[in-house]
């Protein structure tokens, strides 16, 4: 009963916001590169958002075909959109997104880099295909929200990294023990500007409260 109430309350809050926004279509496009060693092409990632009544429909038509090792499956693309949807429209429900999802449709184009078909490689999906799918989701939702003066204060730009530049290295330390490390510079990057003010220089990734680095200057 408690879980159902959380979902129902979240749904009603979402529907109230939808009632304040106009129907329409919003699009955003970005690019990613390096699907494999030696690849110098750019690969397009496109997202279209339709609002029809209380329903939101997301499409990735126009995204580049799956290639190399940077692909993600449908679940990765869907999850990336849910992150932005949660942060921009469900934050007041303590990020309980289940109620809102009753009115969200995901319409993928199979065989694309963020909705890849088997047997595509997905070894770098979290830092490439999923990360690069997240930012257009922020942008199309922000364009939609901008039309309402009261909700406009929730708009924010993407973070300071267009994708996650993962530099991973491993080896043996001076005691002969194995080690591995991932450069975490994007965690200490900037949060983009808000509709009501500047961003945060060392804000990190705003979508998670644990993704932060200390400011050594203070």
Go through the PLM ranges and name each one:
Residues 1-218:
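Glycine/proline-enriched, intrinsically flexible loops and inter-domain linkers
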């Amino acid at each position: 009963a408690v879980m159902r109430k959380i979902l129902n309350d979240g749904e009603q809050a979402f529907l109230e916001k939808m009632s304040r926004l106009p129907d329409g279509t919003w699009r955003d496009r970005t690019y990613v590169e390096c699907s494999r060693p030696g690849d110098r092409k750019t690969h397009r990632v496109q997202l279209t958002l339709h609002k029809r009544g209380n329903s939101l429909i997301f499409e990735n038509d126009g995204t580049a075909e799956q290639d190399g090792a940077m692909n993600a499956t449908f679940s990765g693309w869907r999850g990336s959109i849910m992150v932005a949807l949660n942060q921009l429209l469900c934050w007041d429900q303590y990020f309980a997104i289940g109620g809102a999802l009753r009115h969200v449709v995901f319409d993928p184009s199979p065989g694309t880099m963020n909705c890849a078909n088997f047997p595509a490689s997905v070894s770098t999906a979290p830092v490439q295909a999923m990360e690069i799918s997240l930012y257009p989701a922020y942008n199309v939702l922000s364009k939609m929200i901008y039309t309402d003066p009261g909700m406009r204060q929730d708009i924010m730009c993407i973070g300071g990294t267009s994708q996650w530049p993962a530099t991973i290295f491993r080896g043996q330390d001076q005691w002969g023990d194995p080690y591995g490390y991932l450069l975490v510079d994007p965690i200490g990057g900037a949060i983009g500007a808000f509709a009501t003010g500047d961003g945060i220089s060392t804000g990190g990734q705003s979508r998670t409260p644990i993704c932060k680095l200390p400011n050594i200057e203070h």
